[in-house]
C-alpha cells in the first residue's frame, strides 16, 4: 500500500464498497428498468467493477495494479459462483465478461494515469488546508 495520511478512511471506504457489492449480489433480485434497455444489467456490472478497480488502484503502487485486478476479478467470479447456488439468483456468463471488461478498463486507466490517486488527493487537500 502507498504511504497515505488517512489510510483507514481509504481502506474502509473501499471495503464498504466491496461489502455493498457482495450484499447486492447475493440479495434477491429487485427488478428495475431505468432506461428499459436489455443491456442495463451488463452496463451496471461494467461500471461497478470499473469503479472497484479504480478505487483500489488508488491505494497501491503501479507495480501492484495487476494484483488488484486479479483480486477484483476473483471477487466477481466468486460472487457469480455463489449466485449459481442461490435459488433466487442465476448465473450468467455474460456477467463475468462484463465484470472483466470493467476491471480491464479500470486497470488500463490506473496503469496509464490513476495509480495512487488517493495520495495525490491527500496532497492537494494538505496544500489547500
Stretch-by-stretch model annotation:
Residues 12, 64-68, 90, 95:
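Residue-level recognition of membrane-helix boundary sites in multi-pass small-molecule transporters
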Residues 47-62, 103-113:
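Membrane-interfacial alpha-helical segments at the cytosolic side of multi-pass membrane proteins
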Residues 1-56, 68, 72, 128:
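"…centered on the first transmembrane helix and the immediately adjacent amphipathic helix/loop
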Residues 31-40, 79-104:
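Interfacial helix-loop-helix junctions of multi-pass membrane proteins
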Residues 26-28, 60-61, 87-88, 114:
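Short helix-capping/hinge motifs at transmembrane helix termini and TM-loop junctions
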Amino acid at each position: 500500500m502507498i504511504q497515505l495520511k488517512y489510510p483507514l478512511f481509504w481502506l474502509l471506504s473501499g471495503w464498504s464498497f466491496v461489502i455493498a457489492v457482495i450484499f447486492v449480489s447475493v440479495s434477491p433480485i429487485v427488478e428495475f428498468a431505468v432506461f428499459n434497455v436489455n443491456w442495463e444489467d451488463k452496463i451496471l456490472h461494467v461500471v461497478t467493477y470499473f469503479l472497484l478497480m479504480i478505487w483500489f488502484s488508488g491505494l497501491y503502487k503501479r507495480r501492484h495494479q495487476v494484483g488488484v485486478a486479479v483480486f477484483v476479478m476473483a471477487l466477481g467470479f466468486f460472487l457469480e459462483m455463489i449466485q449459481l447456488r442461490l435459488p433466487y439468483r442465476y448465473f450468467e456468463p455474460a456477467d463475468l465478461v462484463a465484470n472483466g471488461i470493467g476491471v480491464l478498463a479500470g486497470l488500463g486507466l490506473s496503469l496509464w494515469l490513476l495509480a495512487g490517486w488517493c495520495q495525490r488527493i491527500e496532497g492537494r487537500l494538505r496544500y489547500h488546508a
